[in-house]
Amino acid sequence: THRQSSAASDVYKRQATPLEKQIIEAMYIFYDKDSISDPDERDRAYLKRMRELNSKYPDDPDIAALYAGSYMSIRRWDYWDKSGNPKGETVEVAQSLEHIIDKGISHPGVFHLHIHLIEASMQPERALLSANSLEETVPIVGHVVHMPSHIYLRVGEYQKAIDNNIRSQKADKQLDKLWGDMPLPNLGTYPLSHKL
């Protein structure tokens, strides 16, 4: 309920750093349906808040990833027109992610979202560094291992795409074995790296 989530966020905010407090406040906008009743308006408010935080903390990889995610959840695979021109805030979001990548920071969220943002562009090679770097960040997660194939396919590196997908299935099976009999959590996406 609204009261419970508000009370929980108050507890965490008392123990949080100033940046963490701002993230909690942004998450409250996004996750608490009672904060703003209209889902589209709530998504726009969350994007606005993450845009502000990204401007304030441009070197923070978590903020960059959350900003990208807030934008991408609104645009939903509609980042480029048929001529390859960016739509909406695509350029700003790409610059935010690429700023973190250029600093040499290894961050699975930044790499993952960069791949998704750039894959349908006319320059998918812009995300090759993300594709080449993502797997090593969380190699036990099949979806993370699979993701580079989105770029490898677009740039004609077909064998690398095949190899990543084979490894992603092995990672899924390894995780499934480690997980045991407990049901996997429903994270609102495909199971593991698309299927076991």
Task: For each feature predicted by the language model, list its residue ranges.
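Alpha-helical junction/boundary sensor with strong preference for TPR arrays
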Residues: K13-R14, M50, Y57, L97, ...
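Single conserved hydrophobic/aromatic residue that forms the stacking wall/gate
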Residues: T1-A8, Y12
